[in-house]
């Protein structure tokens, strides 16, 4: 516990703006949109978790593209220096500039890149063609819907204007297309060599770029290995 003398010391307190979102009191829609605007944080946590457990080079490259996208957003904001709407009613923001919206740029980069990955990178490997296309369509529509709602939330909560989220979305989409092409044409041919590095082998970093459908591959390999071990276990018990 803090000593009594510490409580009287003057201090300048600042919030952690990464997860600090304000909404109008008593506004249910604003409350829900405030949580929705935290989607970039959830995406980053998901990426870190996926990298820790999967350690796949394409996933690491995807996260690197998101980081580069954020750097470009910061650069554009500080070059244009367009203020946020309504004189900046929110004091706890990372920067006073709003053009382009970093939330919008982040989510549209994530959604557009994922869209390209689903339809251009992943290919059919089994006979369930209809179900494969169905889940891709549903997932793609869901990603685009979330990107739109996050962009809308920034306008609704007065963090950005429509033009700021629009240009953020355009910038994020263009960055996603450019990074996807760069990954496919430049980085992917290097992945087998990178995966063979001693440091990559030490950290169990792998390359699955030559596997058309990683989900189906992992499912079949895991099922085959489980059956093989089950047969061995049954033989030992006899």
UniProtKB/Swiss-Prot annotation:
Pathway: Protein modification; protein glycosylation
Signal sequence extent: none
A GO biological-process term: protein N-linked glycosylation
SUPFAM superfamilies in the cross-refs: Acid phosphatase/Vanadium-dependent haloperoxidase
Spans traversing the lipid bilayer: 33-53, 100-120, 130-150, 162-182
Main subcellular localisation: endoplasmic reticulum
Localisation per UniProt entry: Endoplasmic reticulum membrane
GO cellular component: endoplasmic reticulum membrane
EC number: 3.6.1.43
SMART domains: acidPPc (SM00014)
Statement: the UniProt record of this protein carries the keyword Membrane: yes
Catalytic activity as recorded in UniProt: a di-trans,poly-cis-dolichyl diphosphate + H2O = a di-trans,poly-cis-dolichyl phosphate + phosphate + H(+)
Top-tier EC class: hydrolase
Keywords recorded for this protein, A-Z: Endoplasmic reticulum, Hydrolase, Membrane, Transmembrane, Transmembrane helix
One MF annotation (Gene Ontology) recorded for this entry: dolichyldiphosphatase activity
Key word Transmembrane helix present: yes
Membrane topology (UniProt): Multi-pass membrane protein
Job description of the protein: Required for efficient N-glycosylation. Necessary for maintaining optimal levels of dolichol-linked oligosaccharides. Hydrolyzes dolichyl pyrophosphate at a very high rate and dolichyl monophosphate at a much lower rate. Does not act on phosphatidate.
Family statement: Belongs to the dolichyldiphosphatase family.
PANTHER family from the UniProt entry: DOLICHYLDIPHOSPHATASE 1, PALMITOYL-PROTEIN THIOESTERASE/DOLICHYLDIPHOSPHATASE 1
Name of the protein this chain belongs to: Dolichyldiphosphatase 1
């Amino acid at each position: 516990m803090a000593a009594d003398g510490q409580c009287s010391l003057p201090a300048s307190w600042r919030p952690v703006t990464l997860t600090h979102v304000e909404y109008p009191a008593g506004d249910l829609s604003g409350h829900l949109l405030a949580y929705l605007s935290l989607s970039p944080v959830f995406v980053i946590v998901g990426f870190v978790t996926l990298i820790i457990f999967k350690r796949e080079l394409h996933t690491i490259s995807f996260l690197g593209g998101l980081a580069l996208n954020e750097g470009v957003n910061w650069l554009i904001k500080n070059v244009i220096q367009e203020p946020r709407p309504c004189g900046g009613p929110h004091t706890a923001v990372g920067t006073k500039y709003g053009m382009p919206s970093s939330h919008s740029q982040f989510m549209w980069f994530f959604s557009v890149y994922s869209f390209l990955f689903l339809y251009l990178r992943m290919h059919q490997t089994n006979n369930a063609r209809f179900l494969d296309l169905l889940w891709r369509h549903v997932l793609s529509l869901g990603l685009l819907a979330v990107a739109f709602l996050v962009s809308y939330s920034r306008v609704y909560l007065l963090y950005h204007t429509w033009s700021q989220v629009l240009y953020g979305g355009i910038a994020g989409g263009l960055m996603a297309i450019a990074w996807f092409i760069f990954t496919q044409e430049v980085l992917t041919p290097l992945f087998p060599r990178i995966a063979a590095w001693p440091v990559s082998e030490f950290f169990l970093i792998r390359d699955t770029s030559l596997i058309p459908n990683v989900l189906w591959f992992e499912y079949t390999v895991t099922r085959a290995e489980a059956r093989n071990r089950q047969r061995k276990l049954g033989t030992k018990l006899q």
